[in-house]
Amino acid sequence: MFHVSFRYIFGIPPLILVLLPVTSSECHIKDKEGKAYESVLMISIDELDKMTGTDSNCPNNEPNFFRKHVCDDTKEAAFLNRAARKLKQFLKMNISEEFNVHLLTVSQGTQTLVNCTSKEEKNVKEQKKNDACFLKRLLREIKTCWNKILKGSI
């Protein structure tokens, strides 16, 4: 008898707990029409893209960040939130004051627009050697994700 109740109590519930998502961040995109994106964020992303130069000498290998975090149909806002947090690491590059202003505009503006209520579960790892190739790819992915969101809302 004890064995049956043990299986009932401890057998099924752990399976349910395993199947539930570990963290559910509530993110709601505020401006789906894209006015704030087009008038502020897109301009700063383009400026940052110009400042970082060409990516012709960047390797084709995909960083772990992009393997773990993708802008798919259900997680656009969560991806943008993580990417915006990752951008803040590049303030340490100290390229120029203008670069830092645009970087903060994109990072803080994106976080404001995606409006995530829960805090991230762990700190973002330090980007190795302030990788300019990673920054260029991150900016491109942020821009692509915003464009995907805006096309889906039309």
From Swiss-Prot:
Processing after translation: Three disulfide bonds are present.
Record PROSITE patterns: INTERLEUKIN_7_9 (PS00255)
Cleaved signal peptide residues: 1-25
Disruption phenotype: Deletion mice appear healthy at birth and develop normally. Both sexes are fertile. However, they exhibit severe peripheral blood and tissue lymphoid abnormalities showing a strong dependence on IL7 for proper expansion of lymphoid lineages.
Cellular-component GO terms for this entry: extracellular region; extracellular space
Disulfide bonds: 27-145, 58-133, 71-116
A single MF term (Gene Ontology): growth factor activity
Keywords in alphabetical order: Cytokine, Disulfide bond, Glycoprotein, Growth factor, Secreted, Signal
One Pfam family, short name: IL7
Entry keyword Disulfide bond: yes
Keyword Signal annotated: yes
Similarity comment: Belongs to the IL-7/IL-9 family.
Biological role: Hematopoietic cytokine that plays an essential role in the development, expansion, and survival of naive and memory T-cells and B-cells thereby regulating the number of mature lymphocytes and maintaining lymphoid homeostasis. Mechanistically, exerts its biological effects through a receptor composed of IL7RA subunit and the cytokine receptor common subunit gamma/CSF2RG.
Protein name: Interleukin-7
Organism field: Mus musculus (Mouse)
Underlying gene: Il7
